[in-house]
Amino acid sequence: THGTTYGGNLLASVVAEAVLDVVNQPEVLAGVQERHQWFRNRLEKIGQQYGVFKEIRGLGLLLGCVMSESWAGRAGEIMKAAHDEGAMVLIAGPDVLRLAPSLVITEEETRMGLDALERAVVKLATQSKAA
C-alpha cells in the first residue's frame, strides 16, 4: 500500500497531537465559531448584492461559496480577480470558491480580505455587463 513519506514519523505525530490539544480548547473553538459568522454574514451579503453565490456552505473556517446559475463555471475567474485585488482564495471545481483562512485571523484581516473579494466580484460583474 502507499503511504506518505512522513506519515509515520514520530515527530510529526507529536506535533499533530499538540496542535489538536490547542485547537480543541473551548476558547479556540468559540473563536472559530465567531470568525465563521464574520465570513458567512459577509459572504451572504456579497452573494445577495451581486447574485454571485447561491449557497455558502462549510463548517468552521473551511467555507465553500457555490456559484449561482448566472455565475456558473466562473469560480476560477473570481479566484484570479481576487488574487489581483490581494485576497488569496481557492476553488473546488469550476462552481465553488473555497476559503480556508487561519483559525486566528483578525476581524480587520477578515474585512480586508472580503473587501478585496468584493472588489473582484464587482470588476467581473462590470466586465460582464459591458460585454
Task: Give the ranges of each region predicted by the language model.
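Conserved N-terminal phosphate-binding loop of PLP-dependent enzymes in the Aspartate aminotransferase
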Residues: T1-A131
